[in-house]
Amino acid sequence: MAPPGRRERPFSSGRFPGLLLATLVLQLSSFSDACEAPPTFEAMELIGKPKPYYKVGERVDYKCKKGYFYVPPLATHSICDRNHTWLPVSDEGCYREMCPHIRDPLNGEAILANGSYEFGSELHFICNEGYYLIGKDILYCELKDTVAVWSGKPPLCEKILCTPPPKIKNGKHTFSEVEVFEYLDAVTYSCDPAPGPDPFSLIGESMIYCGNNSTWSHAAPECKVVKCRFPVVENGKQISGFGKKFYYKATVMFECDKGYYLNGSDKIVCESNSTWDPPVPKCLKGPRPTYKPPVSNYPGYPKPDEGILDSLDDWVIALIVIVIVVAVAVICVALYRFLQGRKKKGKADGGPEYATYQTKSTPPAEQRG
């Protein structure tokens, strides 16, 4: 029994840290002898909730995710091995759900965007030339619950047809009795005889054809009288396109007499509004004026100040050459004078030595005496 006046405690403060340490050691030993969470896959998912660790020999099972189906015999489970790793397993046994095959439409073609009917794929439709698409040109393989289905019905390819082309005033077109025209069917327009002295001119395309979107290739032409005034150029003459009357697209050329120049175009055309385009030119007296824009406006031409700069460059080069020549001449003259001075100094120094030698010697006459 405890001494009187002292209460017993189930755990003393000194024993609690030791018990906590023992628990941690036990937990660490358990973790070190276990596998971590099992691997994850794109096409498979774990059956049940994952745990932070698994004991050696413990098994986990997988199933194919939504949109995938299982094809045996590949395993869909794994076991925690003694080396604390999971036995190899893969999701290669799970295949994407596939949409049903769709045939090419009549007079068209169905093209798989990625070459597969798996969900997530696209199926594109095109029609042959002369046919147009009715419906959606792209279908998507989607999941409906667990089944892969297409996003809509396949389209159809129908033949391109055109309604009869427009009728025109003072004219007609071929095949006027036909009520429906197929793709690339063509008609040709022509004008009726005119009641007056001047004929009708066909303004626009004479032949049109049934094209895409069930429309004609061009607007219907127009039949009307187009007549331009007789072109007169004073001090000039007509050199081509002669005639008494000038109708649609008539072309005339001019030249001026000697001593005159042409102001305008030498070639004019009679257009649909019965006027000449360009306007009839004029012949003006005198030589043709020359209009030379500033040379700075044309790339490749020197700027106005470039000539001055070039002449300045020539003067600078000439000045440099002159300075060099003068400097060389001065150096040569100075060197020449220096060498001449040395030569004269040498002669002056040699004279006294020769005289001294002569004075030291006894002249022959004195020796004989």
Swiss-Prot record:
Q: In which tissues is it expressed?
A: Present at the membrane of erythrocytes and lymphocytes (at protein level).
Transmembrane spans:
315-335
GO cellular component term of the entry, any: inner acrosomal membrane
Q: Which PROSITE patterns match?
A: SUSHI (PS50923)
Its domain of life reads: Eukaryota
Q: Where is the composition biased (Polar residues)?
A: 356-369
Please list the residue ranges that the record places on the Cytoplasmic side of the membrane. 336-369
Q: Which Pfam families match?
A: Sushi (PF00084)
Is Cell division included in the keywords of this UniProt record? no
Taken from the record's topology, the Extracellular segments are 35-314
Would you indicate the residue range of the signal peptide?
A: 1-34
The function of this protein is:
Acts as a cofactor for complement factor I, a serine protease which protects autologous cells against complement-mediated injury by cleaving C3b and C4b deposited on host tissue. May be involved in the fusion of the spermatozoa with the oocyte during fertilization. Also acts as a costimulatory factor for T-cells which induces the differentiation of CD4+ into T-regulatory 1 cells. T-regulatory 1 cells suppress immune responses by secreting interleukin-10, and therefore are thought to prevent autoimmunity.
The domain-related comment in the record is: Sushi domains 1 and 2 are required for interaction with Measles virus H protein. Sushi domains 3 and 4 are the most important for interaction with C3b and C4b.
Q: Can you name this protein? A: Membrane cofactor protein
